[in-house]
Amino acid sequence: YVIGNSSVTISGNSIAAALSDKNQKVSSPTVYDFIKYIEDACICDKVARYDIRGKKALAFQEKIYVCDPGFYRLKKNRIKSEYGHLMETICYNDLISKGYKVFIGKTLTGEVDFIAERGAEKFYLQVAYLLSDEHIIDREFGAFSEIPDHYPKYVVSRDRTTLTRDGIIHKNLVDFLLSDE
């Protein structure tokens, strides 16, 4: 379940409930123990949610990211429909490999995929498979609208066309992965 839901918000309660629906009784503390074992085995990372306005890490609504996207494929036979989650997982692993501390950003009404910090450096990142219509473009670029600071903000997608707007920088996935950021 954890591997198959990389880049999705999880909780011990939701996993216990999902297993209970399949007649597999397990308690939330047991689920959290197993998540910790999976983390300790370097199969996945649990990423804290960070309240951007309150400037503090939150102890709930974390996301799990698999450390190797190959694991993701083990539990997903419909990977084509999951490109957005896979790209988010790849970007997370890239940020970690470059030495960033990574959080999920929580705004008043939404979420920013990543807050990346390394020393005094900080930036925000949204990941989308394709910016294929105006609704998706507005959603991805609009995720930054409630962030009052002036740290750099990026949208990463597979698109080759540059769609930078309102000071938010758009980057192609490959260009982002090959950059120092």
Which residues make up each language-model segment?
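A broadly conserved detector of short glycine/acidic/proline-rich loop/turn motifs that flank catalytic sites
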Residues: 50, 70-71, 120, 128-129, ...
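Catalytic cores of nucleic-acid endonucleases
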Residues: 105, 129-174
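Charged, structured surface patches that assemble and position nucleic-acid processing machinery
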Residues: 173-181
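Accessory nucleic acid-recognition modules appended to NTPase machines
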Residues: 1-122
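Conserved beta3 VAIK motif of the Hanks protein kinase fold
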Residues: 125
